[in-house]
Amino acid sequence: MALLQIAEPGQSAAPHQHRLAVGIDLGTTNSLVAAVRSGVTATLPDENGQHSLPSIVRYTQEGIEVGYVAAMSSAQDPKNTIVSVKRFMGRSLTDIQSGEQSFPYQFEASENGLPLFVTPQGLVNPVQVSAEILRPLIERAEKTLGGELQGAVITVPAYFDDAQRQGTKDAASLLGVKVLRLLNEPTAAAIAYGLDSKQEGVIAIYDLGGGTFDISILRLNRGVFEVLATGGDSALGGDDFDHLLQAHMLQVWQLTDIDSQLSRQLLIEARRVKEALTYASDTEASLTLADGSVLKQVVTKAQFEGLIAALVKKTIASCRRTLRDAGVTADEVLETVMVGGSTRVPLVREQVEAFFGKAPLTSIDPDRVVAIGAAIQADILVGNKPESELLLLDVIPLSLGIETMGGLVEKVVSRNTTIPVARAQEFTTFKDGQTAMAFHVVQGERELVDDCRSLARFTLKGIPPLAAGAAHIRVTFQVDADGLLSVTAMEKSTGVQSSIQVKPSFGLSDSEIATMLKDSMKHAKEDIGRRMLAEQQVEAARVLESLNAALSKDGDLLTSDERQQIDTVMAELVQVAGSDDADTIKKAIEILDEHTQDFAAKRMDNSIRVAFKGQSIDKI
């Protein structure tokens, strides 16, 4: 008798229970949770019907408030109400305090220089604050779905570095939540639209959220999502629009010295004005002062657009650079996907349409599209859609490499390489008898270590004491799907190895990625020249050291005239080795090589005689 297998529409009729997994958009301003139910992907509302949760946490003597409750108290208690905590993730306290923006919070530094918020509940770090935002989302999901979650896909900005990504994972770990994967926010949006519209070709993901801007250029082809290039700004978003409006109203009302409570109140009003101007040509802003008096001012759409025009123009410039990195033109982009609440601003949509030459896609709520894409990916990763052929390829934003002799950078994984990825290269020892090797892992596009960003250092010990160049050390760079880097060095003959997982103590500064890319292009010709010089200087040092060792061991094979001739040519190389003329050094090395050919032949003959001494012809 055949057994019927019954399943919800759109779900697999597998004999096992449907596994529960969610996608979480852990946003700077708002956060959402979504899931696939009965084949339909949607964000999950709370008991009041609210889908988004303000990413705000307030600490009081009585406990911890999260979301709308905390938001209502933010103006009255700004010191203990933490907003936009995502901007603090993976950054040092020094970096935060040296920025242009001031914060009402009281900070202390942790042992490794990271920020700690001083609250009535004690010292808390950004990871713990993020966990408090995740907590109600997880509880909401388990209550709505009716069971314990098997895992979650959490989205992060494409520009998050290793420390920021690890911090996001740690926040989920504090709640006992298994992170199936960290997913770049623009890529999550591509999943949401790619599965719905079944498009093939080049697509731009324009993601302007509360705190970050990301632009990603993707190629969609037969279910494969390949990120061709990414760009953006990790400190530009709708929050900056709010701050510009706030500054404008301060100037209009001639308010020069206001406390943090009134400042927060005005910031909330600025956000309301921004949202109102999305649909109206003007709106009235108001502010109630401590003495009860009320300030009022009409703000027009034209005024608002004048304030934010430079920032919007900055996002378009990022689009232009990223298209160039991807090797495509704006005309080749089939569709532009709008992500993030700030893309509702009319000027943003107008500028994006003007640049790409077509109206952007907005059929999926730009506030929810990232969470929806994450939920689709979570449903696949947890095993509910084993038949799915979806393949996702992200890229790394900056090249990864290792320092070699002379302060040079040997790139192991190039910028915009798809991840996950593993790359390996072989290196060797520089000196005879060398038993250890120090490794310096760097990030960047320049040719010299001094111009790149240092990520980590580690040492491989236990290398057999062989002649210089005889040992073979294989160095493997592995970047997982979450963008975290592991580097392993192994000596091939013995198998001895050492490794390190790169978790920087703090992330890149706001504009460092853009600056590094611009500098690499600006100094490209100069860098190549410096690299060629350094390579010749290193080669000169290697040749001189090797020849000195050979002369110490087998110098008696030479006549006095031969030795004097070699010493003279060696002295000439020593004299030019420290110069800044690569061609002169190279020529001196070639001359020395010519004058030592006979010596090399004598050493070879002598080695053969020694090896065969006392051996019979028959035995040989």
UniProtKB/Swiss-Prot annotation:
Keywords attached to this entry: ATP-binding, Chaperone, Nucleotide-binding
PROSITE patterns reported in the protein's UniProt record: HSP70_1, HSP70_2
GO cellular component: cytosol
Pfam families to which the protein is assigned, alphabetical: HSP70
Keyword Ribosomal protein: no
GO biological process, one term: iron-sulfur cluster assembly
Source organism, top-level taxon: Bacteria
GO molecular function terms listed in the Swiss-Prot or TrEMBL record: ATP binding; ATP hydrolysis activity; ATP-dependent protein folding chaperone; heat shock protein binding; protein folding chaperone; unfolded protein binding
NCBIfam families, per the entry: HscA (TIGR01991), PRK05183.1 (NF003520)
Family per record: Belongs to the heat shock protein 70 family.
Protein name, entry field: Chaperone protein HscA homolog
